[in-house]
């Protein structure tokens, strides 16, 4: 049974949890008013014509409705989301995690688990495809809906961010490109579910092992994700370019069909 992870909204507690455990939760970081604005902007973003979108910008479910699963690189197509990922409160928080280095915003994306979605994002480490050295990078996730063990919340292996990158392989899952070749021993790390209410934010280290399960509820589970790295980190551009080429081939083979999307799909 995954451990439910509580944390007080205290800066030092959050930073200590992130550094020692590889993750943390900040409750009510976005007010109800701020959250409604973000939700409205998400709906506006998804209502536009996406027929000219680049391969991989949008991932759809393989169902009759072609429901949206993922929207990547939102900051490249929206001034609002480009600005939101640089929101001062987010930058200040991330900068605290990095210590004496500046926080650099990399991107914004939406992950939407539709009601009763059966798929899982397998266990993986983000740095298996981000390639940061040193691994001073973080995923910041804003809950637009309740995110629980039942709806497919992020589950982290506590302390796994300290061991470096393990061997990965193609996952075969649209929206989650890589997965661990083999899992660490069950007794080595505790599973911790990052349960979130709308407006809460989670932080997970780029090296922490994590996954998400199926959505067993009748509701959407939407998470808006932002990625950051520190000014002292460098990206292996050769490895990233090869990864992006491989991913493009996989997406081309795996997904085709309609690029239409209505508000009811999101």
Predicted regions and their residues:
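Non-heme Fe(II)-dependent double-stranded beta-helix
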Residues: 1-21, 27-123, 129-131, 168-169, ...
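Non-heme Fe(II)/2-oxoglutarate
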Residues: 48, 53-60, 201-203, 207-266
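Active-site region of the double-stranded beta-helix
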Residues: 100-103, 127-130, 135, 142-153, ...
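A structural signal for short, well-ordered beta-strand segments
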Residues: 107-108, 140-142, 224-228
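Glycine-rich phosphate/pyrophosphate-binding beta-alpha loops
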Residues: 126-128, 137, 210-215
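A generic structural micro-feature
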Residues: 131-136, 186, 218-220
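Extracellular structured ligand-interaction cores
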Residues: 135-139, 151, 191-193, 221-223
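Double-stranded beta-helix
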Residues: 147-211, 233-236
